[in-house]
Amino acid sequence: MNSSLQISKKRKFVADGVFHAELNELFTREFNKDEGYSGVELKTSPGLTEIIIRASKTQAVVGPNARRIQELCSLVQKRFNFKEGTVVLFAEKILNRGLCAVAQAESLKLKLLAGLPVRKACYAIVHQIMTRGAKGCEVIVSGKLRAQRAKSMKFRDGYMIKSGQPSKDFIDFACRHVLLRQGTLGVKVAIMLPYDETRKIHGACNIPQPDVVVIRDA
């Protein structure tokens, strides 16, 4: 009984992951750079599936009189065999793109597709991330960059945590693939989020680092 339950849980996790990947691929093809698409989030409950589309220009995602998002909702219901009325789409605005790894990975992808040199594109992304208040960042581009042999280029700045629970709390990570004429490039963006207990900085982490000591005057 326990083994069958475990298998069903594994199948559910795999099915959810495949559904998320297919949704992300669908929206990536549907939206161009004008909407600033930066990923999708799923919230499932019995009888209802909420799909949150993250973008920098939500008005372009919704469309006039919410027509575009309604068409997308019906498209998702038909393509993934959902019953009518069981899927709801929302558009969420990204207020601080500099601290969103998905947004920066998509921006780097568009720069590379436009023919910008890898070093120039990556340094522009690193500069944009650090000027928005990040404590550190790392951009990795791997694949056939110039020569026939594949290689990896890393661009770092600031302070980065690589292991432990703080790496899960403070690091925002995104991975994308760029199809170019010479081959496919892999793009990885990792951002070390700043700590903000007042929650005034959009995209910052409100969990204090365990190794940081704050001295307050009595």
Swiss-Prot record:
UniProt cross-references to InterPro entries, sorted A to Z: KH_dom-like_a/b, KH_dom_type_2, KH_sf_prok-type, Ribosomal_S3_C_sf, Ribosomal_uS3_C, Ribosomal_uS3_euk/arc
For whether the record's keyword set contains DNA-binding, the answer is no
Sequence positions bearing N-acetylmethionine: M1
Q: Would you tell me the Gene Ontology cellular component terms?
A: cytosolic small ribosomal subunit; extracellular matrix; nucleus; phagocytic vesicle
What CDD domains has UniProt attached to this entry?
A: KH-II_40S_S3
Q: Which UniProt keywords apply?
A: Acetylation, Ribonucleoprotein, Ribosomal protein, RNA-binding
Q: Where is the KH type-2 domain?
A: 23-95
Q: Please give the superkingdom of this protein's source.
A: Eukaryota
| Keyword Ribonucleoprotein attributed | yes
Which Pfam families does this one have? KH_2, Ribosomal_S3_C
Q: Which GO terms describe its biological process?
A: translation
Which residues are connected by disulfide bridges in this protein?
none
Q: Name one GO molecular function term.
A: RNA binding
Q: Which family does it belong to?
A: Belongs to the universal ribosomal protein uS3 family.
What PANTHER family would the database entry show?
30S/40S RIBOSOMAL PROTEIN S3, SMALL RIBOSOMAL SUBUNIT PROTEIN US3
What name goes with this protein? Small ribosomal subunit protein uS3
Q: Which organism is it from?
A: Dictyostelium discoideum
